[in-house]
Amino acid sequence: PAAPEPAPAADSVPGLHVQTYCIRAVPCFWMADTVGKLLDAVGNDVRPDDRTLLRVLGAIQPTAAACAGVEGEVTAAPAAVAQAFIRWLTGLAARQPLAVHIRRAGEMDDVSRGVLEYLLAERPAGLTLLTEDGGALGDMPSGK
């Protein structure tokens, strides 16, 4: 039998790359990890119109609240957090190619999985979602 095609090299995708991790037992962990890693990568180079989204994302990632100039604990409804994550991620990807490498994707928490499935269905321009072996992420099992 023929050998399987090798996965595309991670560096074959241009733009910003972040390595993210999943922990099933922690709600929103993948989203929080992604936000934190992206903020580490872009530094304080945050657009003023992103600050509102980052303020909401502060409910799951304290670094986002700090970037938005918010002090203290932030609370937000889960739907607001999911929408802010989707809008911020797609906005970043529209401005520069963005590759999110997902490690332990099978261990993703349910909230993040729902958001990931939304992103996979919408396929926003500039956003590439990759598994830990560097392959592009297709439909993931729902874990149900």
Where are these regions (language model features)?
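Key residue(s) within conserved catalytic/signature motifs
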Residues: 1-144
